[in-house]
């Protein structure tokens, strides 16, 4: 079915910043998609087009990206009479029209908004759920419910505390279903709130951008200790493991790392990549840490390679790989990490996201689907993670509606699948081998 109309507009993300929303109409109805945006962005990401007009939204408006959709992309796609089930064809058309390496002409936010809306319309055209359509596009005969990685303690660029490392996550791998994983996650979250309140006072339970707590602690080990205590109090020490997103590029300074980067600069406290690696090894030894994302700077390839070779845990590339097939290919060759963080807005189209995922999976990597810190109520990534069978998703704490929107959609998908529902559980790194 061809596209009747496409209309983009500025809406607001969860941080009160403008973002792009796209309405796409076919004979089957209206299909709407909204684009997220990140706070700690990798320098190699596709370009998110902002207006940079300081008199409006402090320069963060997206009226240019919206205009590119309404004035250029929409008329072109409508005149070409393309069928919405032809995801790759439509994405390629937009990429050719943009003509730049990093989507800087239209903006990844313009292209992605249309691409997501097309995918939703394609599912309706086929009369199947979105996750099934995505599975078909990726060539997956079955679908898998993911283990949720709940970001329950926030630091780094997401929080006003002194904590350098950005996310401390809990993964309920011992659950039997996604629904049970949600219950375990919520119960640990509420126990954690009480633990933090008792130790640091009530204002320490204010939440960060992704719904996690941001107590004013400096030591990263203290965050792990809080998690360990909360998991124990909830009674799930045998079912919950820990993941971290260090976002080390945020505190990389001249070949070294500053674990107190939110205080006045003092080069004497910087540590070497080897010292930082030793710190991680201590975390893995003393806590149930099974996954570390962005342990080093996005260009510190040697440190990545050395660390990944020395551990058996999941090492996730985000700023390193930015969902970009060229960066992923280099990381595969260098054995820099063993898991891809998949963010649709880093690469900027559904087709390229699928390609990035398949490239990682075909090389034996894990894949974790991810939200961004600036989110909307759009639930596309919930269907994406099920269709791509990656087995793991991070989309914040079980708090804040823009986070719960995704988790609640996953609950609905599991319910809809009924007896056919499969939950990744302890096989979250490679869920297809059961």
Curated annotation (Swiss-Prot):
Main location: cytoplasm
Disulfide links within the chain: none
Annotated binding of Mg(2+) 1, by residue: 40
Leading EC class: lyase
Coiled-coil ranges from the UniProt annotation: none
InterPro entries, per database record: Enolase (IPR000941), Enolase-like_C_sf (IPR036849), Enolase-like_N (IPR029017), Enolase_C (IPR020810), Enolase_CS (IPR020809), Enolase_N (IPR020811)
GO BP term, pick one: glycolytic process
The enzyme's E.C. designation: 4.2.1.11
Pathway: Carbohydrate degradation; glycolysis; pyruvate from D-glyceraldehyde 3-phosphate: step 4/5
Residue sites binding Mg(2+) 2 per the record: 245, 293, 318
Residues the entry annotates as binding substrate: 158, 167, 293, 318, 370-373, 394
Catalytic activity field: (2R)-2-phosphoglycerate = phosphoenolpyruvate + H2O
Keyword Cytoplasm: yes
GO molecular function terms noted in the UniProt entry: magnesium ion binding; phosphopyruvate hydratase activity
UniProt KW keywords: Cytoplasm, Glycolysis, Lyase, Magnesium, Metal-binding
Cellular localisation: Cytoplasm
NCBIfam families the UniProt entry points to: eno
Self-association state and partner proteins as the record states: Homodimer.
Protein name, entry field: Alpha-enolase
């Amino acid at each position: 079915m061809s596209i009747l109309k496409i209309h983009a507009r500025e809406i607001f993300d969860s941080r009160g910043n403008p973002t792009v929303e796209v309405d796409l109409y076919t004979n089957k109805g209206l299909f709407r998609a909204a684009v997220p945006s990140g706070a700690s962005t990798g320098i190699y990401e596709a370009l998110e087009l902002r207006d940079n007009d300081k008199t409006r939204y402090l320069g963060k408006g997206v009226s240019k990206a919206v205009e590119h959709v309404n004035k250029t992309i929409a008329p072109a796609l409508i005149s070409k009479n393309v069928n919405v089930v032809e995801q790759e064809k439509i994405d390629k058309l937009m990429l050719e029209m943009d003509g730049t390496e990093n989507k800087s002409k239209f903006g990844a936010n313009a292209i992605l908004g249309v691409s997501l809306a097309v995918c939703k319309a394609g599912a309706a055209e086929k009369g199947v759920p979105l996750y099934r359509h995505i599975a078909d596009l990726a060539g997956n005969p079955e679908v898998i419910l993911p283990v949720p990685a709940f970001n329950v303690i926030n630091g780094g660029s997401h929080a006003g505390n002194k904590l350098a490392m950005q996310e401390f996550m809990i993964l309920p791998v011992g659950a039997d279903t996604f629904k049970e994983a949600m219950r375990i996650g919520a119960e640990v979250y509420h126990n954690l709130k009480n633990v933090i309140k008792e130790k640091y006072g009530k204002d320490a339970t204010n939440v960060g951008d992704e719904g996690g707590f941001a107590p004013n602690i400096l030591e990263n080990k203290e965050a792990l200790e809080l998690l360990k205590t909360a998991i124990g109090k909830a009674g799930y020490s045998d079912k919950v493991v820990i993941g971290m997103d260090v976002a080390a590029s945020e505190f990389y300074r001249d070949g070294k790392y500053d674990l107190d980067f939110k205080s006045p600069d003092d080069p004497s406290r910087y540590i070497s990549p080897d010292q930082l690696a030793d710190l991680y090894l201590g975390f893995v030894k003393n806590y149930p840490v099974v996954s570390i994302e962005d342990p080093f700077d996005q260009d510190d390839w040697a440190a990545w390679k050395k660390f990944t070779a020395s551990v058996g845990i999941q090492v996730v590339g985000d700023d390193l790989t930015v969902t970009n097939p060229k960066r992923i290919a280099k990381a595969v060759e260098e054995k820099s990490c063993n898991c891809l963080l998949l963010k649709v807005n880093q690469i900027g189209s559904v087709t390229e996201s699928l390609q990035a995922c398949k490239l990682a999976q075909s090389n034996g990597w894990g894949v974790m689907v991810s939200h961004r810190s600036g989110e909307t109520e759009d639930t596309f990534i919930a269907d994406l993670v099920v269709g791509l069978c990656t087995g793991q998703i991070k989309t914040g704490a079980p708090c804040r509606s823009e986070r719960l929107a995704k988790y609640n959609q996953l609950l609905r998908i599991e319910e809809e699948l009924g007896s056919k529902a499969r939950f990744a559980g302890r096989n979250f790194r490679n869920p297809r081998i059961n």
